[in-house]
Design a protein with these regions (language model features):
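Intrinsic-disorder-associated interaction segments
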Residues: 9, 13-14, 35
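A ubiquitous, low-specificity "background" feature that marks scattered single residues
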Residues: 8, 16, 20, 150-152, ...
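Bacterial N-terminal signal peptides
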Residues: 15-29
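N-terminal secretory signal peptides that target proteins for export/translocation
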Residues: 1-11
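Small-residue-enriched, tightly packed secondary-structure blocks
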Residues: 34-193
Length: 193
């Protein structure tokens, strides 16, 4: 390298690319294998996520009864080192029965490092919202439909009378509902399972 042509801007960009490649090569990749989880594994994980949801969120069972469909994305993994990404697979259920499998993919850029897992439940409260999701080739939150994320404090309950949004989301981990979360830009795509 010629010292007279050294450009710190190029070096910074190269370091970002190197970090992104290292993240992918290091095995922090999101899919457990190139085919993803089997349908039975997804259903089992979705059942566990729903049990956790019912336990952590008061009024959740009553709220779910009013939904036309639920997209349950258990154990969505996020990893980041400057460039971040998120991936998970889940089940769309109507009337308590799985009618399809989907993945979630999103990315981010900025000062971030670490890894975490969370569950996401998206409730389609109207037939129109559910049909719009099901008929899309790749549904993007914030573009194809707005997801109203519910954040309630400990001990509070979901009030089915005050929530009027057609699409409602809950993001939680083992500690409970997560605040300051956005699904905007997350893309959901139907899987062939």
């Amino acid at each position: 390298m010629n010292l007279h042509s050294f450009n710190p801007t190029n070096r910074g960009i190269n370091l970002l690319w190197l970090a992104a490649i290292a993240l992918l090569v290091s095995g922090i990749g999101f899919a457990e294998n190139s085919y993803g989880a089997a349908a039975e594994e997804i259903d089992t994980s979705a059942n566990v996520a729903m049990k956790r949801f019912y336990k952590q969120v008061k009024g959740a069972k009553e709220f779910v009864r009013g939904a036309k469909g639920l997209l349950i994305m258990p154990n969505v993994k996020k990893a980041a080192f400057i460039i971040g990404g998120e991936y998970g697979e889940g089940a769309l259920r109507i009337g308590g029965k799985t009618v399809g499998y989907y993945n979630i993919v999103s990315g981010s850029f900025g000062l971030q490092i670490g890894a975490q897992a969370k569950d996401i439940i998206i409730a389609f409260m109207t037939r129109e919202a559910l049909d719009g999701f099901r008929s899309s080739q790749g549904w993007e939150a914030g573009v194809d439909g707005n997801v109203a994320l519910i954040t309630i404090g400990a001990g509070e309950r979901v009030d089915t009378r005050t929530i009027k949004d057609p699409i409602v989301g809950f993001v939680f981990d083992v500690k409970g509902l997560m605040a300051d979360i956005s699904l905007k830009g997350a893309k959901f795509t139907k899987l062939n399972k």
